[in-house]
């Protein structure tokens, strides 16, 4: 699920930078460099020493919030908040340990779930998966339409 959030952030950053390129805020060389870093960036300098450094994942996440702000007027960072909560669940040093437990508000008691008892995962907003899937598709389709309208595509199959 984190990969879905991060990939949605990546397509949102590509969308944002494409708009900046079309508005001539970025040169074609700057835009090309951003795309290179976005698609080929890695921290693996042992096997890929000449590869560009990747974008920090939070820059990608923030690009998704930028899209929400521009398109829908959101004033908070909903996407980042969802990603932060999801990240907290996956870390072995904190909240992730307590996924199968309930903690009292005063933090003094932990109630463990029984072996056969289902834990109410909806408490952790897994509906974010549905939202993020839809959100990714929305950004992708809008970006693709912009590219098809504004760019000369070399192959007919890319146009349909």
Language model regions located:
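A cross-kingdom marker of C-terminal helix-rich interaction/assembly modules
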Residues: 1-160
């Amino acid at each position: 699920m984190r990969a879905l959030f991060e990939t949605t952030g990546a397509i949102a950053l590509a969308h944002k930078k494409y708009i900046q390129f079309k508005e001539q805020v970025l040169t074609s060389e700057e835009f090309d460099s951003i795309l290179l870093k976005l698609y080929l960036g890695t921290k693996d300098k042992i096997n890929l020493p000449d590869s560009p450094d990747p974008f920090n994942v939070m820059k990608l996440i923030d690009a998704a919030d930028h899209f929400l702000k521009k398109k829908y007027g959101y004033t908070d960072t909903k996407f980042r908040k969802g990603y932060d909560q999801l990240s907290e669940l996956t870390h072995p040093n904190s909240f992730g340990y307590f996924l199968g437990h309930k903690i009292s508000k005063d933090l003094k008691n932990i109630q463990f779930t029984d072996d056969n008892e289902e834990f109410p995962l909806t408490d952790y907003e897994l509906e974010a998966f549905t939202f993020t899937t839809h959100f990714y598709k929305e950004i992708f389709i809008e970006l693709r339409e912009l590219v098809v309208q504004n760019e000369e595509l070399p192959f007919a199959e890319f146009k349909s």
